Amino acid sequence: EALVTAKRQGILEEVLACLSDADQMPFRDYIAMLVQTHIVHAHRRWEEMGLVAQTLRETGVDPLMTEAIERSHRRTVDAGIAPANGQVPSLDDALTILSEKVIRGI
C-alpha cells in the first residue's frame, strides 16, 4: 500500500531511502527492536497509522494492511501498558507483557 501510494505521488525513491534504515542491523535485531519499542511507542505509532490510512485513501488506495496495523496498535494503547518512565523492555519482557495484557485468545 505504502509503496503504491509513494509511486503515485512520485516519491518512491525517498520512501525506499527511509526504509533502508532497516539495513543498518541484522533483521533479527530489527524485529526485536520493533517489538520492544512497540510497548513504549504504540500510541504515537497508532496516531501515525491513522494519518497514513488517510493519505492512502486520498491517493485512491484502500488501506487494508494499514487499518489492521492501526487496530493492532490501538489494542496496545487500550491495554494501557506504556511504562510511565518510557523504559524500553527486553524482548522477553515485551513478549510477556503483550501475551498477558494485550494479545488475547479467541
Which residues fall in each region the model found?
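Helical "substrate-binding/catalytic lid" subdomain
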Residues: E1-Q87
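Short, basic/aromatic-enriched C-terminal tail that caps enzymatic domains
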Residues: G86-I106
